[in-house]
Each structure stands twice: as structure tokens, then as C-alpha cells.
């Protein structure tokens, strides 16, 4: 079988309508059909978002001393709280925190940090130590254990490329750029003409999952509409699709999407303002949509980046750093600022020292929102306390 035929059977279409992850092993026995009404939506900020100019230590004079070219004036930051405040583009974030729906987890990172975009994203997506390599994503491992046989829409990635976080041994997730055109011809019929060669059983099962996933997504979309008008941006479009799938009772446990463009080595003030505006407007629309549908208690939104930026500016921008804030919205979180304000006088070779390991946040999400024992997927960090 050539590559073209294999891709047509597994549902990877050149038009970007659907991509399925690569799977490495045969299908094994599974446990426990996914149940429950909670789901988590992950928004990954690719490029390394500058946390210090996102959630700003505006009362710390070192912030202004170390960033003479890019520090944000205390007169323009918003939502001031305990010496910290939001970038002025994040008006929706400030309002969500005022409503008690947004928590900020400060100084999130991991030991022995890696400043490579690719490797640090891989560490976050697999929940590995920085010196270890894992083939499957942390959410993929969770779905493998929680799905009986397979459930092709247990995880949804709104993107044009697969996300390692959702990669598992079973076809329990689907990557789709535009769910509205996620309509395939009868893949089961094509899969049925395969030989009885056991090596092709995997192909047959994945091909059948394409059709099953397509049917489930179309049914969910048919039962829901967009209740509000979203901005005309890529992230907002993705979140609007996710909102419709949630309101249509697709019963996916995890959704994933991303926003590129945060690698601000130069011209940071303008670039980050534009990116944070897109993030704010898209997420606040999503929040408003789900709030109107009385679903925010069922949906937890997690916003993060693979690393922050160095504390001292390089002129008009910043270079790759380490620790940065994470944001958690909805899901009955406690709406708190968790952790100490960034310590700008005690740095690790010019970088912030991490205070909370990102895997402790993952552990809390799995334990509190998905009722899952996080140690079963290899997370040894204790769950973060005080988030939910």
C-alpha cells in the first residue's frame, strides 16, 4: 500500500479538513467509558509569551529598571490586585477575574528548563522531565486509559496539524481545522476492501474512526448555533467551533487549540499588544457564549505558553526565558492569584525561578475536573492546591 492510499484510508486529507494522529502500537484492552459533563479547553500560546508584560508586577521598581524600553506604565495596566495587573489589552481577563471566574497561577515552569521552542513544547505536551522523551502526549495517555475500545471524539484538536498532547495508542482524538466541512465519503466501505492481513487491522480501525468521528461532530453541530458574534480571527473561529460542539453535547473531554506569534525578540510592544488583543477578544467571546448557555461551570479553560521571556529586555524585545503565568478560566475555579509575585531580585542566570511545576496544574485538572488518578499516566507531582 502506498502512502497516498494509506492517507486516504486514515482520513488525512490534503485540504486540511481532517488529520488523525500517528499511532505507534496495536490496540490494547481499555477501561472505563468516558462519562461526566466536565471538559477542558486548552489554548496554547506558541512562541513563548512574555509573562511579565502579560500579568505585570507594576509596583516593583526592578520591573522598570530591567525593562527601560518595554515596561508597561502603571497608569495603563488594568485590574490591579496585590501588586499585579493585566496588560491593557486583557480587559476581558480583568473582568473575568473580577467575576471570580479567572485564576492566575504565577511562576509556572519546570526543573532544568529548555529554551528551545520545539523541545519545551514537547515537554509541556508530554508532561516529561526535561531530560526524558515520551512518545505519547499526557492527554493521549489519559484518553487511552479512560476510553473503552476507542472513542474518536474524546479529544478534539482545532488546528491544521496534530498536537502531541493528544497523541495516544488509540484513535481517541481527531484534528480538524473546520468542522463544518468535516464530511467524508463512506470510509468504512473503503476500509472493508482491505485484505485480512493483520498488519492492516490498524488501518481499518482508524479509517472507521474517521467516519464515526465525522458523524458525531455533524450531529453536535446540527444541535447548536453561535449565540453571539465572534471576532473574525483564527483563534476566535476555533473557539466558536468548540463552543458549538460543547453546546451540541459532543461529550469530548478535552479540546485543544493554539495561537501563534509570541516570539517577540523585537518590536514586542506592538506585536504582543496585537496578539493579546486577539487572545482576549476571542476568549472573552467564548466565555460569554458559554456563560449565556449556563455552561461555564462545566468548562475549564487553560491558557499557557511553552516558556516566558527573560527578565531584562534586549532593547525593543525579549529573548527566550523560563517561568511564566498560566490562566485558568471557568470550571468553578476559585478566581485567585496563586503563588508569589515574580521575584525580580533573585533570578536564575537572568530568568525567573519557577515556583509551580506545570505538571502540578495538570494533576489538579485531572483530579478535580476529570476525576482521574493522575499518577496512572506518570505524573508524580502533587496536585496544585487552591485552584478548585
Q: What residues fall within each predicted segment?
A:
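N-terminal export signals
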Residues: 5-26
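Intrinsic-disorder/low-complexity recognition with aromatic hotspots
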Residues: 22-86, 92, 97-99
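Extracytoplasmic mature domains of secreted/periplasmic and thylakoid-lumen proteins
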Residues: 31, 84-186
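Beta-strand elements within well-structured catalytic alpha/beta cores of enzymes
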Residues: 38-49, 93, 103, 253-259, ...
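Feature marks hydrolase-like catalytic cores characterized by long aromatic- and Gly/Pro-rich stretches
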Residues: 71-86, 264-388
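Patatin-like phospholipase A catalytic core
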Residues: 147-233
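Anion-binding catalytic surfaces of enzymes that hydrolyze or transfer phosphate/sulfate esters
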Residues: 194-285, 289
